[in-house]
Amino acid sequence: MSGNQAISRVICHGGLAPWQVQLAQRLLLTDLSADHPVTQVAAHCGLSRSHFEKAFKVSLGTPPHRWLVRQRVQHAREMLEQTNDSIGLIASSCGFTDQSHLTRVFHAIVGSSPAAWRRERKAGVVLL
């Protein structure tokens, strides 16, 4: 078996094909505030929900929901840094149910609350 055949075999049997990764990411990122049922994204990729979830995790190292939450937090970080929008508005724009939900998830991923992160950024302290 050649190297290309081995790669194709791994993609077919373990993860998503490159076009499926691109399509899934594009669909999930189209509107971060929208609810993206995994079943619909899977259908666009021509897969069942369970197969899609397993293949997505193999391809990207994380389940689709967790990947989407991280993208939402990244977008919230950008909005916190680049706008003066309220944290509640940012939460809504990024697909969180409310400010409290954003704060819990943001703190779990970033290590500080959105308000503290914003204050520190504006004060010139950089938190990664």
Q: Which functions belong to the PLM regions below?
A:
Residues 104-128:
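…primarily DNA-binding HTH/wHTH and HhH modules…
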